[in-house]
Amino acid sequence: MSRSSLDLDSIPCGAIEPARASLSEPPLNTALPIAILLVEDSPTARFHAKVCLKKGLSGEYSLHEADSLSAAMGVLSEVSVDVVLLDLNLPDSHGLDTFRKLAQASSNAAIVIISGDTDERTAVSAVRLGAQDYIVKGDEFTPELLGRTVHFAVERNARHLLEKELASVRHDLELADMIQQRLYPHNESQFPNVSLAGRCSSATQNGGDFYDYITRQDGSLMVVIGDVSGHGIGPAMMMVESRAFVRALASTQMSLGEIITQVNQLLSDDMQQQLFVTLFVASFSASRNQLSFCSAGHPGYLVKNDGRVLQLQAENPPLGVNPKECFVENSVPEFEQGDLLALFTDGISEATCDHQDFLGDRRVVEEVVTGRTLPANRILDSVFTLAQNFNGDAIQHDDRTAVIVKTHPSGQ
């Protein structure tokens, strides 16, 4: 829609609504020049807008021009812009259809509608559809108004893009958490002569703790608990990798020591600096009435029927500390069917409400000993309740994971 016959002073205009722009808002702080695309078919209106931009923008900017929708599309295919100043009525497109097409082609740009007085209602509709603002041509179309509008539009759009990015990240984290939750075992009732109960409560959306139950080729039950240092997506990814390595190697005939030695070598190749993994792996053989374990900086506790406690821990360091470390499988001759194995990460033993007094391994083990005649899931509940009560109203700062393994004499 050409307006070249109009006098500059007669170009219709309007002011920004106070609710959408306020002089009290801080100016946009950007180190790069603002890239602007001016889409206007009237040479007179285009000239007036350029004069207003030159006088109204305090910072540097680059300006691209187009007199039709197709020309604007051509510009957007070659350059990235921060703001589009858009006349909705062009020779090859009219009304909201113009906005929709430009918005699709420039999804990351702020669009400001430059409206004539006869189509202000359409401009308002465009704002409802996602345009950052609109200006009605006329006497109030001033350099100050246009400069302020451009700055505020870029600022609001930047916030909008950040919110979209954060929402995307949040969705990815939720998806990762859902996948991570599915990795925890759900086969606790499938092992003869053994009652199993395990749980992981992450401090953040994606935790670095894990536990697993694996049946090996010889029929033995392999129980694993691990704790990757740190929190967040990095440790969570390392947790998934650690679990995958252990599961893959458990399908072989390697000993526990050989499995963990190999896992350590594989993880050391991928381990980020300052990350490490504490790990405890136990193997139960009901047919041979045997218990063995391999420890990488992580203890386990064997609770006897009479309440005596044996701490199971080797001198090997956590995984990722020394890629050449040789881990050893240790037998437990004191083991008898009917004994109980308690495994937990330091998120439980280091529960605290003031960062001065910590729950400690001793109190956790005492809780297990006290409830040793209860079902495994009841013992597990009491351990988590103990940690939560000790933590009080303080924020949980570390992942909490525990596994209780109760063995039963054959036939029970």
Where are the language model's segments positioned?
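Acidic, metal-coordinating helix/loop segments flanking the phosphotransfer/catalytic sites
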Residues: K50, E65-V83
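… and, occasionally, acidic/histidine-rich disordered N-termini of signaling adaptors
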Residues: K164-A342, A394-Q412
